[in-house]
Amino acid sequence: MPSTKPASSTISRSAAIASPVPETDILTLQDVSVRFPRRPEAVLSDVSVRLAPGEQLIVFGASGSGKSTLLQTITGVIPHSVVASLGGSVRMGGTLSIETSVVELSRLVGVVAQDPASSVCLPDVEQELALPLENRGVDPALISARIDRALDAVQARMLRHRSTGQLSGGEGQRVALAATLIAEPAVLLLDEPTSMLDAAGLGAVRRAIRSAVDTYRPAVVLVEHRIDEFTGTAGIAGLPPRALVLGEAGTVIADGPTVDVLAQHGRSLNQNGCWLPLETELLAVTGCAGGLGEPGVRAGLRSLGEPAGALGRRQDFGRIVLTATDVVIDRGVGAPNGTATPVLAGVSLDLRGGEIVALLGGNGTGKTSLLLTLAGLHRPSVGTVTGARPGMIFQNAEHQFVEHTVRGEIRHGLPSLSDDELQAILHRHRLTHLADQSPYRLSGGEKRRLSVAAMLAHDRPVLLADEPTFGLDRRDTIATLAALGQAADAGRSILFSSHDLRTVATLADRVIVLADRTVIADGPVFEVLRWDEVLKQAGLELPPLIRHLLKEFDSDARIRRVLGQLDAAVGAPT
């Protein structure tokens, strides 16, 4: 989202605070601190940020650094709807948010969240976009033209008469963006807007955001983990021109031009587990600037691949522990068997002990439906699933929470779990300081860590995980992959879905690809990732790093070693 507007503050936080507040700023946070009940440490500490109309800001920070809390504070959800102690002041358009209702604030600030389905209220797109205007009393004669303008801005005019229930992930997110911007908010908050999308949907949403911002010119605050996918081929230039970095204590570490912030803080951000543009990560690890096109960077990556060693995991997997045979999964809810168009048909697969299998496919190809069927939570209309009873990690972590505290969630169903074992699990997943918190009060990344920790605590021979690294920062992604790897090394079978092909290349032994309502490929991970025809049919797009490594190395062991060395540059969880 390029912009010619200069950043309104410098790298020096103290200088930013000392500067007078211009009357033209649309958003002003001054010395803001947020504390939640039963959580002694502040989630945000003395945060001061000013945002001018049309200015664009990206927020970097590890999981738990307060990014979600910052967005909730800007919208007024904190403290109006979420119980929290708010210090300092938040002004939106010159008005103190503490003195303004969330309803009034919603006229000034719009939010596009991770899951487009969570914000959809009405059955068709036209009604969905008309609703915000009707709520504001807009002349009905003007609404149709406003709908066309909003859909044009997100490049989705063809969706106007579609059912919202039939939209793909990318289409749904573009409609959510249009429904947010149609009311012309002064501030647009983008909370990981591409995190649940496949490559095709992500590209469409990326283009839609840029087009919509150019049309409506709101101030923008972006939180995004999938930095490289979000920017596409533009790299750092595709990010908002101003960056704010939050430390683990919720303090402002840096605030200034994105290029300068990444140049000065890239190494520490990488060590602290933030997802970064690839060129910044490679500079931090190899010491060479310029990205994959520079000889020094390529030489640095080659050196990381030496010596090749072993792949790190044994290849002689154990016995078959779960089998699906000729499975058909129907789509229609309440439709008689055989009358609904199937989500998947003719699916047969085996899972072996000690093997890690990645399940790939675009949005809507049936990955979640297949996992739920294998878990025994959905019954196939045709075919059979036999074998061990699996454990399931849901994409939405809250769907598996049943207790009131983090420690209770891990203990659930494990009466013999000792206190020492519980403490070890809490420590391994960086949850010790949250042991007495409600699972529902955690950040998105913390909820994901808890869902993984709770299911790994059960000794199920088969573990199914729906996007297990969704919403995690780099450090917690690495820790989660390590935990899944250890479970496989102990003989458990792992099947996980993912949109992240770097994660797949790092962890998986085998890949199953879904497209056109069936399995189109099933084979060793690097063999499948080299099948261009399969990737194209499935709508999958290799990240630039993985594409480069597949061309650079004939040895799969060296590819995995490079990926491991890049992960090793990230600091271990504390």
Locate the predicted segments by residue:
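ABC ATPase C-loop
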Residues: 180-181, 455-456
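Helix-to-loop junction immediately C-terminal to a conserved catalytic motif
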Residues: 75, 375
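ABC ATPase nucleotide-binding domains
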Residues: 266-323, 535-574
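Conserved ABC ATPase "signature" region
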Residues: 141-159, 419-434
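H-loop/switch region of ABC-family ATPase nucleotide-binding domains
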Residues: 223-225, 498-499
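Conserved beta-strand-loop-alpha-helix hinge in the C-terminal portion
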Residues: 249-274, 518-542
